Swiss-Prot record:
This is tRNA uridine 5-carboxymethylaminomethyl modification enzyme MnmG. Keywords: Cytoplasm, FAD, Flavoprotein, NAD, tRNA processing. One of its GO terms (cellular component) is cytosol. NAD(+) binds at residues 273-287.
């Protein structure tokens, strides 16, 4: 039967991609349905209880700048905050937070339930309803059908999910949840390229059975950083410590002895696992020369005794898990509350997606999250927001909302996926971005909030706060440029005390702040030069923009040069064999990837600058050159 109401946007799956997708569509005014197999697991942290990190923290800030949920949710649920790379430049500094997974999940659910235009319904999705290569709705496990003008698939690891513990395996989307078998089978009959990936998780331990006195304590930063541009330290719950211990040779021997019963090393698991989050079996095999590996002992929350031993993800049999865990210092009497496991699942080749995350084969159908071959909550949330926004734009008959590699890590993420695809779970790093100095955590709102406002993602309160900040930055920078300090200033001794070399001639306050050793806040404490503005976000911008102005300008020039052909469109279904001079290999790669623009074509592995030149000449000669709007 058909449900009596129809929807603008239907989102299938309530994980990190699904929550951001449904909230984005609803914020933009679309009547949105979030379809989940279990309302109680909305926003569930299936693996590690943490948000952020190198590259990932940048994505969270960008989600927040566009009005998304993840940053606010972690600010209200994190039990430890740290700034990574704090001694390095602002481009690679990253925020990471340890979450209370119960608080996080509750905050997400509460936000979803109170979002205008959003309805939540509990039923697994078993099929997509198509008409003439266009999705028009979905069908659930009990046969109930929902009409939708656009559909976003955010099904995570649930498609034909297979959980492995030793040589035993069973169907599941994650421990305790059923796999999505029927939907996976239906989608295999559609024109999508599919493959299998694998990820894993460590056993969980009871903290009461551990000896923390022999471990290294790792406290959070004080004062603690804040993720959301709208947040404050007052949002944070109680802060507690994590701990560090290590594996040893005895641990490694237990693992080696169990490899003959490992699903990874006996060929039972076919999917490729995450390169940057390897299992402990992989670590001791690939890095056989290392006598120990670090383990971060991370509390799962304030009201539970469970801890997450980050660094020993495994799918070894349970008896081997027991032996390897109890061989670790501080874990000698450990009680395992949940076994570690690996999970294999279906994913779709993201090269079959447009930059908007819409399928190239089925109109109005969008994909986001692990279904596209990524790993991580942050990568999923970023894709979910973009997919949800574009599903809404499709309903409203608006242009697609896409971001370039020079605009956001979101742009880098989606461009990498849609252009290059992936054969292993894709994780974001700052090293993947060419324009890191422009794509900092601190300026995510400056880069994106105005764009989010234009399409309806950003509400009035955030928009007002953003404009106040920008006004503060501009007025203060004008003051710093126009305020001059003479070398006989009454406080010259205090000024020179901040400088490596004393002032030899007059200088503006801006000139002084450009010096690497000078801190804006310290300089403003000197009588007659300040006071510093109270807005800490604005003062951070003032310092970074002033100190790095030359480098930023050079990077902007570089972007302008590269953009000349970046946005040149390639006609759909273009026949590359028409171009004489292209090798068969190049033609095959271009046909396989179907790049939408010259920029995307240039980033395909094996496509040479000479091939791009031939393509440009042909398009120009035949009057096919045109830019994206």
């Amino acid at each position: 039967m058909w449900y009596q109401e129809s929807y603008d946007v239907i989102v299938v799956g309530g994980g990190h991609a699904g929550t951001e997708a449904s909230l984005a569509a609803a914020r933009m005014g679309c009547k949105t349905l979030l379809l989940t197999h279990n309302i109680d697991t909305l926003g569930q942290m299936s693996c590690n209880p943490a948000i952020g990190g190198i590259g990932k923290g940048h994505l969270v800030k960008e989600i927040d700048a566009l009005g998304g949920l993840m940053a606010t949710a972690i600010d209200h649920s994190a039990i430890q905050f740290r700034t990574l790379n704090s001694s390095k430049g602002p481009a690679v500094r990253a925020t990471r937070a340890q979450a209370d997974r119960i608080l996080y999940r509750n905050y997400v659910r509460n936000t979803l339930e109170n979002q205008e235009n959003l309805t939540i319904f509990q039923q697994p999705c078993d099929d997509l309803i198509l008409e003439n290569d266009r999705v028009v709705g979905v069908s659930t496990q009990m046969g109930l059908k929902f009409k939708g003008k656009s559909v976003v698939l955010t099904v995570g690891t649930f498609l034909s999910g297979l959980i492995h513990i030793g040589l035993n395996n069973y169907q599941g989307g994650r421990a305790g949840d059923p796999a999505s078998v029927n939907l996976a089978a239906k989608m295999r009959d559609m024109p999508f390229r599919m493959d299998r990936l694998k990820t894993g998780t460590p056993p969980r331990l009871d903290a009461r059975s551990l000896d923390f006195s022999v471990m290294e304590e790792q406290a959070g930063d004080t004062p603690s950083p804040v993720f959301s541009f709208m947040g404050s330290q007052a949002d944070h719950p109680e802060q507690i410590s994590c701990f560090i211990t290590h594996t040893n040779e005895q641990t490694h021997q237990h693992i080696r002895d169990g490899l003959d019963r490992s699903p990874m090393y006996t060929g039972v698991i076919e999917g490729v696992g995450p390169r940057y989050c390897p299992s402990i079996e992989d670590k001791i095999t690939r890095f056989a020369d290392k006598s120990s590996h670090q383990i971060f002992v991370e509390p799962e929350g304030l009201t539970t005794h469970e801890v997450y031993p980050n660094g020993i993800s495994t799918s070894l049999p349970f008896d081997v898990q027991m032996n390897l865990v109890r061989s670790i210092k501080g874990f000698e009497n450990a009680f395992i509350t949940r076994p570690g496991y690996a999970i294999e699942y279906d994913y779709f080749d993201p090269r079959d997606l447009k930059q908007s995350l819409e399928s190239k084969f089925v109109q109005n159908l969008y994909f986001a999250g692990q279904i596209n071959g990524t790993t991580g909550y942050e990568e999923a949330g970023a894709q979910g927001l973009i997919a949800g926004a574009n599903a809404a734009n499709r309903v409203k008959e608006r242009d697609e909302f896409t971001l370039g590699r020079d605009q956001a890590y979101m742009g880098v993420l989606i461009d990498d996926l849609a252009t290059l695809g992936t054969k292993e779970p894709y994780r974001m790093f700052t090293s993947r971005a060419e324009y890191r100095l422009l794509l900092r955590e601190d300026n995510a709102d400056i880069r994106l909030t105005e764009q989010g406002r234009k399409i309806g993602l950003v509400g009035d309160t955030r928009w007002q706060r953003f404009n106040e900040k920008m006004e503060n930055v501009e007025l203060e920078r004008q003051r710093l440029r126009s305020t001059w300090v003479q070398k006989d200033h009454t406080k010259i001794d205090q000024i020179n005390a901040l400088l490596k070399t004393p002032m030899s001639k007059e200088a503006s306050l801006e000139d002084l702040i450009r010096r690497p050793e000078v801190n804006y806040t310290d300089l403003m404490k000197i009588e007659g030069l300040g006071p510093a503005i109270e807005d800490s976000q604005a003062s951070e911008q003032i310092e970074i923009q002033t100190k790095y102005a030359g480098y930023i300008d050079r990077q902007l020039d570089e972007i302008a040069k590269k953009k000349r052909n970046e946005d040149t469109k390639i006609p759909r279904d273009f026949d590359y064999q028409q171009i004489s001079g292209l090798s068969n290999e190049v033609v095959a790669k271009l046909k396989d990837a179907c790049p939408e623009t010259i920029g995307k074509a240039s980033r395909i592995s094996g496509i040479t600058p000479a091939a791009i030149s031939l393509l440009l000449v042909y398009l120009k000669k035949h009057g096919l050159l045109r830019k994206l709007a």
